[in-house]
Amino acid sequence: FKTIDLDMVSNNILNSSESLSFLENYFPTAVEKNFINKETLASIVFNDREKLTVLEDFLHPQVLTKLQEIISESEGVIFVEVSAPRNLQNDFDCLVIFAPEHTRKERLKKRGMEILDIENRINSQKDGEWWLSLGTVLHNQDLNNLYSEIDKYLNINNLH
């Protein structure tokens, strides 16, 4: 199945010249020598909800436009990986791949994130109930279990 990673789409948009100009205006400390320091930007927006909203309001419409473009050029079942769905569940069948907070924290630690950054990031997100309300929930214990759950969902819904 084709998979679209919206974090990658977002990063591509953030690295554009239009985004650089926007970031220089709104988040000047996150721009160094015409390059975006993503750690600095993340630190800014995950510590200030208003600044996160400013970034999302700039970025999300562009991400949605790019997503629609990619989908229009594709056929069949497409998986879209989304970390911040912002109403996408209204347009698509939504599988929520859910892991408990302690599991998410452990995974982020293994990726080298500091505990304060992890806490700030998690605290800026919607709570578990909101995520669970978005669609069909698959509990993410490990990859083998996840693949099995996805296969079951696809078979039940005749999407294979």
Give a label for each model feature.
Residues S19-E24, L95-V96, E114:
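Short, hinge-like loop/turn segments at secondary-structure boundaries
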Residues V9, P100-R104, L143:
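Conserved nucleotide-binding/hydrolysis micro-motifs of P-loop NTPases
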Residues L67, K110-H160:
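Small-molecule kinase domains that catalyze NTP-dependent phosphoryl transfer to phosphate-bearing small molecules
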Residues M8-E75:
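ATP-dependent small-molecule kinase phosphotransfer cores
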Residues L20-E24, E101-K109, E119:
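An amphipathic alpha-helix signature
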Residues Q68, S72, V77-R111:
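ATP-dependent NMP and nucleoside kinases share a basic, alpha-helical "lid"
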Residues F1-D5:
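A conserved segment at the C-terminal end of the G1
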Residues L14, V45, E56, Q89, ...:
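Short, flexible helix/strand-to-coil boundary loops that buttress conserved ligand/catalytic motifs
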